[in-house]
Amino acid sequence: GFLSGLFGVGGGFLMTPFLIFMGIPPIYAVANEANNILASSTSGTLTHWFKKTMDLKMGWMIIGGGLFGTFLGILTFSYFKGINKIDIVIALAYMYVLAIIGSFMLRDGIMEIDRIKKKVIIKKKLHTHYWIHGLPFRTRFRTSKVYESALVPVLLGILVGYIAAIMGVGGAFLMVPAMIYLIGMPIKLIPGTSLFVTIFVTGFV
């Protein structure tokens, strides 16, 4: 709950592995943690709603892609469950996804520490421009003050929804870094928007 309100994550990336380590079968750990994420995300969203620290337009676009991604994830989950391989899939998914995200964040942390030690002042943009920013259907998100292709949040939602369905997480541990580095949203709007998306994605799971 504390992590949910502070960082905009549901906490599933911590609780689901913890439940598995306690001896609970992965298939049940995923289902149980989805309920916990839904409750904590709803509470956090209400708080950010009253504080007006949410970008609803961005959130709805991510949700649109998220519901489709969740549907694909459920199909994948059902397939591997049918061939009795779902436990292995969940374990491998956690290992690879957390390792990849952790390595990127570790790299950024080391670079920032090195920059501080060298006392180098770098004026940088909110986010780096990648090929994905050249996609069509650009739209203005006035709350976040960004001008971005509508396909970016939709594609992000598909990825988040797919991972959420398989791993039993809200996907915020992936969504929050993407909002910062890929979309360039203001930090103050990210927790509320992330929790808002998590309600619908996890609820569909």
Residue ranges and their predicted role:
Residues 173:
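Periplasmic/extracellular electron-transfer cofactor-ligation site
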Residues 13-59:
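Juxtamembrane transmembrane-helix termini in multi-pass membrane transport proteins
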Residues 50-159, 181:
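Juxtamembrane transmembrane-helix boundary motif
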Residues 24, 184-185:
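Helix N-cap/coil-helix junction residues
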Residues 4, 8, 12, 16, ...:
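Alpha-helical transmembrane segments in multi-pass membrane proteins
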Residues 117, 186-187, 195:
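Structured core of small recognition/catalytic domains
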